[in-house]
Amino acid sequence: MAKILTVFNQKGGCGKTMTAMQLAGTCAMRGYSTLVVDMDSQGTALVWSTVKPDPQLRLKATGFPAKVESFAPLGRGMVRPVADLAPLYDLIIIDTPPAVASEAPWAALQISDLALIPFVPTAADMWAKEARVLARKAMEQNPDIKGVHHLPSMVRRGNTIAGVLDQFKSDPEVSLLNSTVSLLNAYLDSQMLGLCVGQLSSSSTAAKEMSALSDEVLTLLGLAKSVAVKRKGKR
């Protein structure tokens, strides 16, 4: 039975789809049967998964490693179809549109085991307040959810960003993941090829970030213990 993870935020432009797809691709590469449910009407995740690398590039990877389906037209009605698919996968990641313009995120949270809120760490005071509100509302939608965690996304280097993250870490009402997702060209490059960063290079900074994020998320979901089993089964 799949564990269900919802990636959401009140706004757009914070790396929700990038997070959902890179995380899904990384977990799929580890042997987890993974489905991405694209709830955004723009269909970015679905389009991403249909792109095939140019054969002239001679890449080993020929396509995105996780399954992607769009349930965007269903809106709040996506709950039952997703629940019906749960027995077929190890992990289902729901990529949602901005919550300010859609009820889909709140519907997805009702069947989720865990939620991630990617955010761009710029204005600490503004984000801290919004982070608390989003986390509380998510818990209201599903009191049984294992956790609602914030993921620093599109992170740039610098003392200002470090200061913002330090403020978040000291806030007892905000659950901040240890992992971060930096603003790196590798993420966009892999998207343009219809792949995830781990398929291009397992040693790149981006691939290492996604590996760390996968470790953290799988542990929170209670799936990490099966990593060794999954890998052993693929030998």
Model-assigned labels for residue ranges:
Residues 154-157, 166-198:
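Beta-strand-loop-alpha "switch" segments that mediate conformational coupling across diverse proteins
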Residues 4-10, 14, 21, 25-102, ...:
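P-loop/Walker-type NTP enzyme "switch/lid" segment
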Residues 214-225:
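Short, hydrophobic alpha-helical segments
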Residues 188-214:
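Inter-lobe coupling/hinge region of RecA-like P-loop helicase motors
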Residues 115-117, 124-155, 161-168:
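Anionic-ligand binding region
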Residues 103-123:
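Inter-motif core of Ras-like GTPase G domains
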Residues 41-43, 122-123, 155-158, 186:
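Conserved nucleotide-binding/hydrolysis micro-motifs of P-loop NTPases
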